[in-house]
Amino acid sequence: MKRLISIALVLCMAVSMTVFAANTEIFINGEKAGIAEGMGAIVEKQGRTFVPVRFLLEHFKFQVSWQEKEQMVFGMGPEGEIFVMQVGSELLFYKDAQNNEKKVTMDVTPFLNMSEDRTYIPIRFIAEAMGYDVGWDGATETVTLTKK
């Protein structure tokens, strides 16, 4: 009986391990953009490359704030840009410096990693909303973001 329970636990753990740290590298406008130690990691989940929201927004010089009660991330860019997203929602809102608004519906849901206290979002959706072309090289596991 103990053996059966042990096997069942191992199988449950194996099935639930769908999130893992990736060896993926990110280049933004030709420069490597690494996530600082203690600031999260690049994560592969549901066939998408997720990054901590704070990492990417701060790379673009945004001031980032977290609203715990609503579980929302707010970003204010250096030229008045606005970024808003909520954990558990597939909707992302972005307003650029010219006041053009974009509401993007993602095909996967951003998630909160409680152990790291980090909110993760698919890099493609946030980058495209902010006017970047997104490239993927599967052979080198490299994401490239290039400003349009």
Where are these regions (language model features)?
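Primary recognition of N-terminal secretory signal peptides and signal-anchoring hydrophobic helices
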Residues: K2-S6, C12-K148
